[in-house]
């Protein structure tokens, strides 16, 4: 098609010379070439794949027809500004047939078009700059890890205690303890060798953990680990963040069998660990034993003398029971319901817990936010709040939060 257009242009070159005797028309075309900045147009044409002659000479009209195909989409946006540009954008292809109606206004409006060519070039380039800014690669930034992958605030003793207490048999093997910790806390799914060594050291060097050998009915590898029966409540109110006291067992077994037979009660008390009994209860029990021995020795006396030791013994018994009751109020039993946000009942899912949500508990646990495969039941469903008797203070939380998070009424 290019050859056909060229041939058509050469055929009509002689006819145009008969119509226009004056050669100024062609000089004005060359002036228009410099005024319009056709060099930049030709470079734009070469960028789009249309290579043609850079100088507008004999085939100037032919170049104009090709310029229309490449430039009219970008020039039509500016054509309403000038009348000459509108004539150029509309009738560029018809220049081969009627050159004089379009060339004279274009030659007259050369300065205005020259001012607009730079603007057109800038419009052609601006999408490229904008796209380069959009597609610019962002610098890799090291963001902080979320709370689900943060280190839990529990010690290794707390983790082991939680794992053992949640098991139905209250004893676990070492691999089961590892697996329970990794399932509940995603942080421990990496660097396993480090923290597993720490778990083994904690099991070996703490008196609150006992190693139970496997029974014949439970074949397998590895011994079981369980909590010492006298360890009691090591963690205050079921909170595993801090131990209330360190458990140490007095392993002072009597080697004399005669002392075992004569002093069975004292031997059992020496085998017991110091986390179970207080000095006050020991002194009261000693006084009780002494009073009973006095009562036995005084049985051979007269009834009035014998009545006084019995009444004294009853008085001491009542005092001893009152001391035990007082200690029962001070020291909670081993089996109790944990209502602390970091207790094992709140960490593990339980279908029996249908308590209301305490907003302070919600805030604390969502701050740490330890996810697990049971994240749906752990994070929301199993966080039991205070008991039904201890209703939450809703006025405080309404003052703290602008909008209530959960229905605390």
Curated annotation (Swiss-Prot):
Residues 263-286 have a biased composition (Low complexity). Residues 250-262 have a biased composition (Basic and acidic residues). May play a crucial role in specification of both the axial mesendoderm and the ventral nervous system. One of its GO terms (molecular function) is sequence-specific DNA binding. It is found in: Nucleus. Induction: By mesoderm-inducing factor activin A. Gene3D superfamilies: Winged helix-like DNA-binding domain superfamily/Winged helix DNA-binding domain. Keywords: Developmental protein, DNA-binding, Nucleus. Signal peptide: none annotated. SMART domains: FH. The keyword Electron transport does not apply. InterPro entries: Fork-head_N (IPR013638), Fork_head_dom (IPR001766), Forkhead_box_C (IPR018533), FOX_domain-containing (IPR050211), TF_fork_head_CS_1 (IPR018122), TF_fork_head_CS_2 (IPR030456), WH-like_DNA-bd_sf (IPR036388), WH_DNA-bd_sf (IPR036390). Residues 250-315 are annotated as: Disordered. The keyword Transport does not apply. This is Forkhead box protein A2. Its main location: nucleus. Residues 150-241 bind DNA. The gene is foxa2.
